Amino acid sequence: MQNDAGQTVELYVPRKCSSSNRIIGPKDHASVQIDFVDVDPETGRMIPGKSTRYAICGAIRRMGESDDAILRLAQKDGLVPRDDVKSN
C-alpha cells in the first residue's frame, strides 16, 4: 500500500517457519519468533549484528515439538554443543 507521497507503508512481509519452512500466515497467532544474541562478557550488553533469529509456526507448537525444533536449529548453527555420546 502507498500513501499520498508515494511511500510504501504497512507492507506485510511473510515469515517462514525455521523448522518446517511453512509460511507463517498473518492469522497464525500461535507462532513465536525468538532471537538469540551474543553478549559482551565485560559490559553485559548485546553485540550489534550478532544475533540468530528463529521463527516457529503454530502447527509445530501445537504438536509440542517447538523445544526440540529450537534445540536442533541451535545445534546446527553452533549455539548449543551437540551431544555426541556413543552408547555401548
Curated annotation (Swiss-Prot):
Pfam families: Ribosomal_S21e. PROSITE patterns: RIBOSOMAL_S21E (PS00996). GO terms for molecular function: structural constituent of ribosome. InterPro entries: Ribosomal_eS21 (IPR001931), Ribosomal_eS21_CS (IPR018279), Ribosomal_eS21_sf (IPR038579). One of its GO terms (cellular component) is rough endoplasmic reticulum. The keyword Ribonucleoprotein applies. Keywords: Cytoplasm, Endoplasmic reticulum, Ribonucleoprotein, Ribosomal protein. It is found in: Cytoplasm, Cytosol; Cytoplasm; Rough endoplasmic reticulum. GO terms for biological process: endonucleolytic cleavage in ITS1 to separate SSU-rRNA from 5.8S rRNA and LSU-rRNA from tricistronic rRNA transcript (SSU-rRNA, 5.8S rRNA, LSU-rRNA); endonucleolytic cleavage to generate mature 3'-end of SSU-rRNA from (SSU-rRNA, 5.8S rRNA, LSU-rRNA); translation. Belongs to the eukaryotic ribosomal protein eS21 family. PANTHER family: 40S RIBOSOMAL PROTEIN S21. Component of the 40S small ribosomal subunit. This is Small ribosomal subunit protein eS21. It comes from Caenorhabditis elegans. The gene is rps-21.
